[in-house]
Regions:
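Active-site beta->alpha loop and helix N-cap motifs at the rims of alpha/beta catalytic domains
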Residues: 1-37, 41, 75-78
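Mobile acidic interaction elements
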Residues: 5, 12, 159, 163-165
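Catalytic alpha/beta core domains of metabolic enzymes, predominantly
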Residues: 29, 41-134, 140-161
Length: 165
């Protein structure tokens, strides 16, 4: 009930505001009731802490096809467990194609290559931290160029430690 009250208040902040709701509570219980209720009140939602296409499918079964919804799938955290998030994104994006009001967000970026993965899959949104954006600027460099830059960095490090290369 408290989440509903907060969501209603946040929704008054502006037309471009999305209310963030976790897909499940801290006990792992699916938050379908509140998702459906807020969606039916035309409150834009960012449903977060999603990890798989089954969760995406459960969300899609509840929502209408007019109120905007973002489904945030945590790719980096999934990858941290040794699981490839790409198949779950691919399935989720395909499921969401029937809903013009739904966007899939690639959350929890860990490396620049995630940007390319999200782009290749047709992900609608990707949240990229500044440190990763800086690394994306390396895209297009040749391996020979990277070798030269790496060895130059080794040279700088060796001079700092009074060693010679």
């Amino acid at each position: 009930e408290e989440m509903k009250i907060q969501a209603m208040k946040i929704n008054t902040w502006g037309k471009n505001v999305y209310v963030k709701v976790p897909v499940a509570n801290s006990k792992g219980k699916f938050m379908g009731k509140i998702i459906k209720e807020l969606n039916n009140k035309n409150i834009k939602l960012n449903i977060t802490a999603v990890y798989n296409a089954k969760q995406t499918e459960k969300i899609l079964k509840l929502i209408n096809k007019k109120t905007k919804v973002i489904i945030s799938i945590f790719a980096g955290r999934a990858g941290d467990t040794g699981k490839d998030p790409v198949p779950e994104f691919s399935k989720s994006i395909n499921l969401a194609k029937r809903y013009k009001n739904v966007e899939i967000l690639w959350a929890s970026v860990r490396e620049p290559y995630n940007y390319l993965q999200a782009k290749q899959l047709g992900c609608h949104i990707i949240t990229v931290p500044p440190a990763i954006i800086e690394k994306i600027e390396n895209f297009g460099k040749s391996f020979d160029q990277l070798t030269k830059e790496t060895v130059k960095a080794f040279l700088v490090d060796s001079k700092k430690s009074n060693f010679k290369i």
